[in-house]
Amino acid sequence: MTKIYWNINLEEMMEAGVHFGHGTRKWNPKMAPYISAKRKGIHITNLTGTARFLSEACDLVFDAASRGKQFLIVGTKNKAADSVARASIRARCHYVNKKWLGGMLTNWSTTETRLHKFRDLRMEQKMGGLNRLPKRDATILKRQLARLQTYLGGMKYMTGLPDIAIIVDQHKEYTALQECITLGIPTICLIDTNCDPNLSDISIPANDDAISSIRFILNKLVFAICEGRSSYIINP
């Protein structure tokens, strides 16, 4: 795997609040190796370890992107949704940022059918076909299209299962994580001090509640993906 310097700065991580964990009463003992201190009832994450795991994750996604692999970024809580969409669009990744529908990956045939329906409705709307239908029929189809856009809008170009999944919040996205584990899809997961570091292929100890922390981690991963994609275009 290619090793590149990703300019992961500890001071910048502190400014982004990456090191702030949950309250000391709300923690998973498996996270003990990644916690450096307690401060005012809050666990503090060891940022040196975070930087190491983030660097490993960047190496992994760079290498995968340089070989044309596909990524899915999952983060559905309100604080993460906008950052997930922006990061995914920037790196041309698929994403889910509103709600994870059970079976999105493990029942791929159903998801694929929904995606085909979504694409057909989008094309119909673009060509003005919906406006030529009776008002009642058009209203029903437009409502279906709006719902599909909400839940599948970030996956509209997916034609198969992703090669790697990036998950922003282990607790919130537990169903998505379990589906990836079931299917053997490698996962990179942001884990706060209340998470289980053993569930993902690469776990990045970090504050998964603060927008600034989520954005910092995603920006590094997305930059690595973009660099990898550039390498793939130059040397296909």
Curated annotation (Swiss-Prot):
Presence of the UniProt keyword Transferase in the record: no
GO biological process: translation
SUPFAM superfamilies: Ribosomal protein S2
Keyword line: Chloroplast, Plastid, Ribonucleoprotein, Ribosomal protein
GO molecular function list: structural constituent of ribosome
Entry-linked Pfam families: Ribosomal_S2
Single GO cellular component term: mitochondrial small ribosomal subunit
Primary residence: plastid
Ribosomal protein is among the record's keywords: yes
Subcellular location: Plastid, Chloroplast
Domain of life, per lineage: Eukaryota
NCBIfam families to which the protein is assigned, alphabetical: rpsB_bact
Family: Belongs to the universal ribosomal protein uS2 family.
HAMAP family registered for this protein in UniProt: Ribosomal_uS2_B (MF_00291_B)
Name of the protein in question: Small ribosomal subunit protein uS2c
Organism expressing this protein natively: Ipomoea purpurea
Lineage of producing organism: Eukaryota, Viridiplantae, Streptophyta, Embryophyta, Tracheophyta
